[in-house]
Amino acid sequence: MGSFSIWHWLIVLVIVLLVFGTKRLTSGAKDLGSAVKEFKKGMHDDDKPAGKLGDDSRSAEQAREAQAERDRDAR
């Protein structure tokens, strides 16, 4: 009586799907997955030497500049 059976969890799942819809749930799951991936990447970056960390930020800056140029060209 104290624990939930599989039927309780299935009913809760159906109610959640009806309330939020599948599109919002998949979007939320995708965002959660990318956040976990970024967190793991950040934890892995702690192991890199200080010289290597600067290289990633430079390539990120170049990517931002390239995206800004594409945005300007699109207008």
Swiss-Prot record:
Q: Does the keyword Cell membrane apply?
A: yes
Annotated Gene Ontology cellular components are: TAT protein transport complex
Q: Which domain of life is it from?
A: Bacteria
Q: Which UniProt keywords apply?
A: Cell inner membrane, Cell membrane, Membrane, Protein transport, Translocation, Transmembrane, Transmembrane helix, Transport
Among Gene3D superfamilies, the record links this protein to: 1.20.5.3310
| Record region (Disordered) | 41-75
* Protein topology in the membrane: Single-pass membrane protein
The protein's GO terms of the molecular function aspect are: protein transmembrane transporter activity
| UniProt-listed HAMAP family | TatA_E
Q: What does this protein do?
A: Part of the twin-arginine translocation (Tat) system that transports large folded proteins containing a characteristic twin-arginine motif in their signal peptide across membranes. TatA could form the protein-conducting channel of the Tat system.
Family label: Belongs to the TatA/E family.
Q: What is this protein called?
A: Sec-independent protein translocase protein TatA
Lineage, uppermost ranks:
Bacteria, Pseudomonadati, Pseudomonadota, Gammaproteobacteria, Lysobacterales
What gene does this protein come from? tatA
